[in-house]
From Swiss-Prot:
It comes from Arabidopsis thaliana. It is found in: Nucleus, Nucleolus. Belongs to the RNA cytidine acetyltransferase family. NAT10 subfamily. Residues 994-1009 have a biased composition (Basic and acidic residues). GO terms for molecular function: 18S rRNA cytidine N-acetyltransferase activity; ATP binding; tRNA N4-acetyltransferase activity. It catalyses: a cytidine in 18S rRNA + acetyl-CoA + ATP + H2O = an N(4)-acetylcytidine in 18S rRNA + ADP + phosphate + CoA + H(+); a cytidine in tRNA + acetyl-CoA + ATP + H2O = an N(4)-acetylcytidine in tRNA + ADP + phosphate + CoA + H(+). GO terms for cellular component: nucleolus. Its EC number is 2.3.1.-. This is RNA cytidine acetyltransferase 1. Its main location: nucleus.
Amino acid sequence: MRKKVDERIRTLIENGVKLRHRSMFVIIGDKARDQIVNLHHILSKSVVKSNPSVLWCYKNRLDISSHNKKRAKQLKKMKERGQLDPEKLDAFSLFLDVVDVTHCLYKDSERILGNTFGICILQDFEALTPNLLARTIETVEGGGLVVLLLQSLASLTSLCTMVMDVHDRFRTESHSEASGRFNERFLLSLASCKACVVMDDELNLLPLSSHIKSITKVPTKEDSEALSEAERDLKSLKDALNDDFPVGPLINKCCTLDQGKAVVTFFDAILDKTLRSIVALIASRGRGKSAALGLAVAGAVAAGYSNIYVTAPSPDNLKTVFEFVCKGFDALEYKEHLEYDVVRSVNPEFNKAIVRINIFKQHRQTIQYIQPHEHEKLSQVELLVIDEAAAIPLPVVKSLLGPYLVFLSSTVSGYEGTGRSLSLKLLQQLEEQSRAPVTGVEGSLSGCLFKKIELSESIRYASGDPIESWLNGLLCLDVANCLPNPACHPLPSQCDLYYVNRDTLFSYHKDSELFLQRMMALCVSSHYKNSPNDLQLLSDAPAHHLFVLLGPVDESKNQLPDILCVIQVCLEGQISRKSAEKSLREGHSPHGDQIPWKFCEQFRDVVFPKLSGARIVRIAVHPNAMKMGYGSAAVELLTRYFEGQLASISEGDDELEVEPSPVRVTEAAAKVSLLEEQIKPRANLPPLLVPLRDRRPERLHYIGVSFGLTLDLFRFWRKHKFAPFYISQIPSAVTGEHTCMLLKPLTLSNDEFEVDESDELGFFAPFYKDFRIRFSKLLSDKFKKMDYKLAMSVLNPKINFPEVDLTGNSPDGFLKKLDGVLSPYDMERFRAYTANLVDFNLVYDICKTLAHHYFQEKLPVSLSYVQASVLLCLGLQESDFSSIERQMQLERGQIYSLLLKVGKKLYKYLNGIATKELESTLPRLKDRVLEPHKVSVDEDLREGAKEVEEQMRARIEELLDPELLDQFAIGDKEAEALQKSKISSSGLISIESTKTDNKKEKPSGFDKSAKKRGNDKHSSTSNKKRRA
């Protein structure tokens, strides 16, 4: 049955066409696809030009194939099964055949950037992300339609509980329940969009779109050819410059007055040919920045510039730039293949993007793409174009600037990567230095001429577009003006940290929405690269939490307090041992839990993932409160909070438990039909800001952080006692920075681990020691180009030591033996170098060896910071002297002098070790230990005398024993013999023995006695001769 379309729908579309504003339709129902034909028909009748083109975006499958033959077979089968009404089937089939429909997968949505369509159809709502939403809606021209197709819903509030595809990335092992806060806020925001209609698949308007009940038609202009004031000014500009070559033909390609003025400004700088001139172009998304840059580059080629370099985060970002370079060449009547050639990349990652254009009409000219970190290739450049500079880190952008003409464009609000830091920091610095005298400015940017251009008028649609305002508010894109200056700057010690309740923050209440816009403005103005997807991560991810640092709050004033600092924290860890072992075995890490998985991978440790920790995702300080200590105060308060110093962890206070989840829209909505459902923001919400003393903290073992490694950021975190454990060896292709992760153990972890209480790193100390050794070994290869100041900060070596007594017991860990480190020949060469007898080249190998030992703190020798830096550059990074001169700004003679001082100090210590080793090999007298007597000398003498007297008395008694004296008695015969005997002249006396000899003498014995007598006789003779 035919049904008349609601007149308000037709009026909304016609008003959009007249005002060049876009309209949005949300169609709910299984037959929502059939209403696209009607909406397209209404739009076609309203516009004067040909049928509007259609962009159809989907997740992975279309209900009806986009291929003609496949679609015919598919429709035939559906008709036979009775799944389609023949009348509607013919209408939709005719629609697909007649209308120019571009089908695009969500994952391939980047290829539609820069294109323009009349209608954008989005199906598969569960696959949508904020980035996809902004990217696809941005392609619709003024007067066009945005159509969102939803499956049949019992109520609109069921969108809030819909499981989105992106939620899979938000879930972790310990946090598995993702919320639907973003969908709830999206649904509530539809009621505030004056150009949005929510209806069912029969085009019945739902109560959520009650705001269009009073819609009226916009009066039609009497003169359809009448131009707006901006269009008249653009026409006047084109007529004035029409005869000027080459700027005239290029201005004719411009669509808005802002774009035309930008091209004129670029061309003035080109013709001026002044070195050190910078022209910055900043605007929101869809203002024609890239097109203006492309036309300006074509003009530079016509003006005779030979070497032009173009850079962006990726060659895909330069698609529009190169496209308008070619359009500019067409306007200047350059012929492709005859006067210029286009070279495309063969790198599959660049998707055949244009990377080079060779021009050879007048002389050889080149337009070449380079990556942002390849600034060393800019030696011969005449013009450098930097597109999407907001997505490139500030240090990299600064390294690209030099004594040549620079065109720079930046997106200050959009969806590819926004950042006010470029305009707030770099552009402000350029403005200040352009006013300063050349002699009074230091650095590479001194004396530069600076111009800034801002584009406000959109290319595709007119100003005041309601869809743009709604999208900017929903995704917090244009929040630069939402950040007021702080009323005062209190002392950091007077500030307090508050926990932000996310249910209240994303409830779409007026005050909560203003607070959210200010928070996102702080994040955009920081050094982080921002994306609309970050908003959905903040709202739906179960492990993420928000904290804000506020000054003293005056409760008597009914106004929101000034936000000085925002901290986004992600809870990680509590991973089972089984999951950790599986990850190590398969070499794959799930989404989330960055620090635990990376720690597990680096140290092959399955215990650390079981610990619970918090990763600081971002910390953003108000741009007008930088360098005032607010960031440090926020980190200190957060650390104390998780250590239980602000709110007790161990106490079992029920009122301090995590607040219960409030009633959601889905629970608050009345159980009514879709056509009667009233959607309103929730009431009775908990407080937006919760003091930390009123909320129990999670029990954590550590706090971590991950960021792109820069010197200022690393020093900030090291100041707060965070220690690194991982630095990626491969720098980012976009930023040129190495990813760095740091940890800080909390005091609660010391209660669960056996650690040295004197070591502030606790259980993390051995891992940090291992990291330093690995990092020092990689400095000569993967980190060879790292700035020496950053390398010194990462290593954090101990360079001041007390005097070490080599003769005594030196502390453990110091080098005590030269065996295996330096040979005697090495020591002799080293001695000769310290005595100025040989050149440094002769001991360069020794320098590398000793550098590794010194930075492992095995050589307790005190060095100055400059001396240690030179030793690091030569010994660890193995840099040449030219590189050291350039980095440290020292003369070569000064470097040699520093090396000699270092050598003398190291040789003194090593020579002491060698001397000690030599002394240990020499023989030594045995040391006798003299102990004091236990008795005095007099007592010792008395005891000795007593012992001697007793011995003498016992001996006398033995001698006077009668039995012993009997052996000396003289017998009768002996007495008689003595009386009668006389000594003969020979002197021999014969005594007859009374004892009988029973043994017979042996002949051999006789011989021996004879021989003995002979010997005695000979001996007697010799003695007589000696006496004579």
